[in-house]
Amino acid sequence: MAAHLLPICALFLTLLDMAQGFRGPLLPNRPFTTVWNANTQWCLERHGVDVDVSVFDVVANPGQTFRGPDMTIFYSSQLGTYPYYTPTGEPVFGGLPQNASLIAHLARTFQDILAAIPAPDFSGLAVIDWEAWRPRWAFNWDTKDIYRQRSRALVQAQHPDWPAPQVEAVAQDQFQGAARAWMAGTLQLGRALRPRGLWGFYGFPDCYNYDFLSPNYTGQCPSGIRAQNDQLGWLWGQSRALYPSIYMPAVLEGTGKSQMYVQHRVAEAFRVAVAAGDPNLPVLPYVQIFYDTTNHFLPLDELEHSLGESAAQGAAGVVLWVSWENTRTKESCQAIKEYMDTTLGPFILNVTSGALLCSQALCSGHGRCVRRTSHPKALLLLNPASFSIQLTPGGGPLSLRGALSLEDQAQMAVEFKCRCYPGWQAPWCERKSMW
């Protein structure tokens, strides 16, 4: 093993050099990428506050917009004629997927995609954010139960003499069949129009591991969730990336349960990818810089539990999302800038560089380092005794300077193994595949 480890005795990295490798496809052969999905250009345009993420090796659209060449997100009102119910129970575009026109939806979606992504060779992230209903009947609880109620009512109106169990079974089949047609059809159209885009739905898969108050909380997906997710194989098969949410609920603050929560949510994404027959399907969890629905920034240990945990499991990257509400005032923009400059940015540089160095040292530069199950707490963070972050004279990207010691490399080999990129194989990804 020691013979394989690369003798990186004087490896110097600068973010400028790393960023130059981005042109072309966004993710291939890139161990870990942080994508900025925030409208922070408002901070500059409206408040004169420049939240500069480029110096920390973060990928952002020109002008830091929600939609651009590197990252485009479609909310429900921006793609086709998504059917849903308002909070007052009023149907929009038919309310139910089985009560709406898929043909009309795809026709409008065709135009919406061409307008939002004009470049035919678009190779960025293409995320669809539909949250009103879920494609599995069993997952539509609480406020989403209206979709089950209205589905039953639709069948009952057509067959008033049917018994309740028959109505339930047919309503479930109709809803799930229509939900599949809508979601799969939308992905298929996106892939046909922009075939290099990383198409996928935000929030899928979900682990539903929200039982934080349990005294024996482990973070594992509750019983039955994996079986339900396995029924969504058609969704994983049509997706070109998976975008699970690892937003930190506010109730987790100070509990010490965050790492378990994130660990199993990210692991479920990798599990469904393998189950769907595509172990190389990119996983890019969505992360907020705040605890969800608060203005409390994630402290450093929670960044380790979210970004760091994702990188350690071999995620292709993360998507950092910031609500427009967090950029409404000059004070909030200044707070984001300070957090980026002092806490978030240096951490991103640390974990991104750690993933790259591990890939080079352990995986011949042809794969990602993935944490071994025997070391569930290991992270791809640089040894502060070996590396330092330095300002570039006159501004510009920060420089990460240092060298991997033999001890650093040996520890990586103990704690991590390789997941090879497509086209490479062997324990250290040193051989090209024959297929």
From Swiss-Prot:
A GO cellular component entry from the record: extracellular space
Catalysed reaction equations from the record: Random hydrolysis of (1->4)-linkages between N-acetyl-beta-D-glucosamine and D-glucuronate residues in hyaluronate
pH dependence, entry free text: Optimum pH is about 3.8.
Domain EGF-like residue range list: 354-430
Coiled-coil parts of chain: none
Active site: E131
Predominant localisation class: secreted
Region forming the signal peptide: 1-21
Glycosylation sites: N99, N216, N350
EC assignment: 3.2.1.35
Keyword flag Signal: yes
Compartment(s) of residence: Secreted; Lysosome
Gene3D superfamilies with a match to the protein in the record: Aldolase class I
Uppermost EC category: hydrolase
Keywords assigned: Disease variant, Disulfide bond, EGF-like domain, Glycoprotein, Glycosidase, Hydrolase, Lysosome, Mucopolysaccharidosis, Secreted, Signal
Official protein name in the record: Hyaluronidase-1
Source taxonomy: Eukaryota, Metazoa, Chordata, Craniata, Vertebrata
